């Protein structure tokens, strides 16, 4: 997405992890939601992490756009980790994943009603890979990011994350942070207080 800040080397890293033929067909980088988690900042303050440099507290502000894979409440920050859901704002997806997804969900084909271009003239179906839904099992709202990941996993495609990356998310503030810093504080990287990093 255009509001994600990243190091260009991170793109090459995702490409290397998700290279054709790899079992890692979907790989994302972690970026923070557009909010400040004041309780995490307070933990860092209480531990003295901002005493010498108060700007270092910016590493502790975020809830990240991912959820760990089912049954996993710890993620190592120095290796690729399987996740249940990750943000599509910084994600690399192999063509094979799109093809597998399309075969699994033929009901997501539709005829577009925007027909003012050569390739969208209303005569061919296109695929809705990203949509917002209410999960029928949990009644949880799934954003287009999370819906895509959940349906991909249901189609047998695992979703992976490179947790060492440091991305930003631009809003009214440049939301940043560091999963490594959050691990040092022993706080959750998401809004779930039971999930931990190590």
What positions do the PLM features span?
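C-terminal catalytic/acceptor-binding lobe
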Residues: 103-198
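Conserved catalytic core of nucleotide-sugar-dependent glycosyltransferases
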Residues: 7-133
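Short acidic donor-binding/metal-coordinating loop in glycosyltransferase active sites
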Residues: 1-4
């Amino acid at each position: 997405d255009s509001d994600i800040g990243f190091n260009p080397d991170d793109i090459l890293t995702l490409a290397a992890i998700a290279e054709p033929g790899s079992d890692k067909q979907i790989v994302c980088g972690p970026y923070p939601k557009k909010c400040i988690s004041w309780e995490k900042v307070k933990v860092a303050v209480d531990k003295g992490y901002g005493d010498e440099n108060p700007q270092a507290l910016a590493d502790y502000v975020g809830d990240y756009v991912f959820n760990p894979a089912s049954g996993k409440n710890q993620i190592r920050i120095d290796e690729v980790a399987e996740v249940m859901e990750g943000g599509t704002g910084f994600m690399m997806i192999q063509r094979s994943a799109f093809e597998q997804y399309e075969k699994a969900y033929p009901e997501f084909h539709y005829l577009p009603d925007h027909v003012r271009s050569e390739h969208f003239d209303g005569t061919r179906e296109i695929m809705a890979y990203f949509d917002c839904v209410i999960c029928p099992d949990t009644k949880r709202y799934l954003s287009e990011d999370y819906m895509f990941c959940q349906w991909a996993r249901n189609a047998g495609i695992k979703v992976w994350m490179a947790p060492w990356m440091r991305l930003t998310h631009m809003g009214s503030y440049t939301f940043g942070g560091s999963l490594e810093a959050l691990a040092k504080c022993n706080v959750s990287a998401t809004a779930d207080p039971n999930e931990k990093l190590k």
